[in-house]
């Protein structure tokens, strides 16, 4: 694969963080939206499910277009859609209008994920790509956690409308910046125009390893976003915590992300630990965190404790899980599409659509099990983590079979 330009890591970061930060800022206002529209919390949570579905549609289509027309013009188009939909959201008169606007918003902002990943693969290869993802990983969780902090203050001192005003301003700034300095990284634009989308699609449909990687990424991100969807109702509505204080608590999760990211970078770069072993360590952290989460959640069901202790019992397990998340996801992203170098945009869009559908499914489950306590959500986290471990075990088996077949040839 030929590299024509290496996009700076900071520019990749600015692409990657827009979507998750948009979601975490938004979820801080879910209880406020519930009261404003006089609806059940589970209905408000479905706006996030629709956001992830819109994201899946966006990456499925816009990633393909970036193979044909280049990365740069599609990024600019996506940002324009993001800005317009954010403005529409400000003037939503009912929850249905907001749901539609959120779907469109996600469609536009999906360029940050799918084309950002394509640009990363266009620019870096092999161990260098793993290292870049490991460096980016803590910031991909740190900055969205900061989003909860920002969202909490916006909600506390104004209203949910100003969340979308903020999105509009950020989108406008990024559009102007990218228009001026974003490079084109796709060397295979001409090749992509002659490639057949459905041929790639048919290959991916039969690629069991890619599907399993997509499930793992979707399940782990589903846990992460599901927490931000459910936690505001528990802390702000039930424990009567101020939105700004909730934002500060959510921000604490970022320190686990930073630790996990730097641990991953240290193990890969300094200790030369194999990627698969780093992934296994990530799964161990996740399982430990999710098991502790379930235990603590059921203790809180039957024993009355202070708010401070209850908050610790909710956040500490999630911090442990997020360390595992930071170790696991960057490496998974590197390996998932290593066989699709010449159709990175197309393959990445299909792959991304699959794992965002998984995220949407997990967040939908969160809305269906929404209740007075967090015990149902903790069980969902544990099931998702265990299912991911099983998927990883099956991936290892498939790799061994693949290696045996290759050696026989």
Curated annotation (Swiss-Prot):
Pfam families: MFS_1. CDD domains: MFS_MdfA_MDR_like (cd17320). InterPro entries: Efflux_drug-R_Bcr/CmlA (IPR004812), MFS (IPR011701), MFS_dom (IPR020846), MFS_trans_sf (IPR036259), Sugar_transporter_CS (IPR005829). SUPFAM superfamilies: MFS general substrate transporter. GO terms for cellular component: plasma membrane. It is found in: Cell inner membrane. GO terms for molecular function: xenobiotic transmembrane transporter activity. Keywords: Cell inner membrane, Cell membrane, Membrane, Transmembrane, Transmembrane helix, Transport. It is a multi-pass membrane protein. The chain crosses the membrane at residues 3-23, 43-63, 73-93, 95-115, 135-155, 162-182, 209-229, 248-268, 283-303, 309-329, 346-366, 379-399. NCBIfam families: efflux_Bcr_CflA. This is Uncharacterized transporter RT0591.
